């Protein structure tokens, strides 16, 4: 590569990036360097470091889209310099966002008349969308309590222990008590009966998850709605439901159209969905839509005019790129209902291929269900010598990024591996992954147990540990061990399960 800067007497080799002073010396890490460098050198230095990142296509921990068509890539690059918040300057982009909101609201069966505009907003992801929905519920609850002359300083929200961290953030940041329904082995989603039991007069809403991060399972929103209807009748309360459909919102309408989880249920007042997951758009784009205009309090909507015109806004952030909004509209009109259904069908079929391949090894228990988000969550049948964290670590050698994690309370003694099936995960990749799992298991069989042999026979005060105690101890050890393991570039060897 030839550098753009003319060579000087002090550096005759400046014409070659790899022979120049720019790669002979360490690049600045903590302070802005005093001098400029040629653009080719800057590109090459950064590009070389980025090679140590994992391959996004082989990152099976993530639900986030990692491939789009070249035509959509082109549209995104052509609009990358547009600030989405500047509605007056970019009216067409604003119109495209409104079209997306209307399409998604109708996809979720919002009670809208012909030509009636839906109520919703684009966000940077489902985390922001969940927080906006939560703020609307909190303000609605406060307004009702104030009107009745009742205390409004102790709001709570009910959900399962399988929630995404964004809901925990909402509760902590906006001072709302989080009431979690504990999980149990074999049942890794919120139990609607237990959730409704936890509802009281201070509950601003119950959050149901359509597509658990842990297992991909859809929670029973219809049963939750029916139970809440009965409780509301008995108590005189009006406890509503929010559906976190970050993963499942672009799956259920196409694969399970008869499943009632959305605005067909009267207590569902708002729904969020991630466009950058099964909406098939690169990160980060999310959406939140409300059932009716009255479900979003007017006082939460701000009006600004310093960008040239009066603009309503209800977001936690302000400036953001418009590329993802444009890409979402591209996917909606490019694929249509037929295209989305075909993509989701293919994901489900590839999930079944992987699931059956893992079952045939005879080494795994499948934890996830066949219906739901197309993923496979599974655990070792025999973890007496080696566990899931070791399997995940060794898969890295083949390029695969597969997360291993423990379940939340009260199922934290259960450890699983999880593979998310995205649009770009082919049948061939599924078959190769199964083969690589078998190679890893064969190699582990030839190795001595690194931890279990020492801990399995352990005793506490002369009393032998139960299998559950041993498993918890081993899992905690391995989680701590793997969390501290990094490659030579400081990158963790095992991906976390966070994905918004």
From Swiss-Prot:
Q: Does the keyword Transport apply?
A: no
Q: What class of enzyme is it?
A: lyase
Q: Which Pfam families match?
A: Pyridoxal_deC
Molecular function GO terms recorded: calmodulin binding; glutamate decarboxylase activity; pyridoxal phosphate binding
Cofactor(s) the protein needs: pyridoxal 5'-phosphate
- Protein name (database record): Glutamate decarboxylase 3
Spell out the disulfide connections: none
Q: Which reaction does it catalyse?
A: L-glutamate + H(+) = 4-aminobutanoate + CO2
Please give the tissue specificity annotation from the record for this chain. Expressed at low levels in siliques.
User: What's this protein's family per the entry?
Assistant: Belongs to the group II decarboxylase family.
Residues modified as Phosphoserine: 8
Positions carrying N6-(pyridoxal phosphate)lysine: 277
Task: Share what the entry says about its subunit structure, partners included.
Answer: Homohexamer. Interacts with calmodulin.
What are the record's GO terms for cellular component?
A: mitochondrion
Q: What does this protein do?
A: Catalyzes the production of GABA. The calmodulin-binding is calcium-dependent and it is proposed that this may, directly or indirectly, form a calcium regulated control of GABA biosynthesis.
From what superkingdom does this record's organism come?
Answer: Eukaryota
Give the UniProt record's GO annotations in the biological process aspect.
Answer: glutamate metabolic process
Could you confirm whether the keyword tRNA-binding appears in this record? no
Q: What EC number(s) has UniProt assigned to this enzyme? A: 4.1.1.15
Q: What are the alphabetically sorted keywords of the record?
A: Calmodulin-binding, Decarboxylase, Lyase, Phosphoprotein, Pyridoxal phosphate
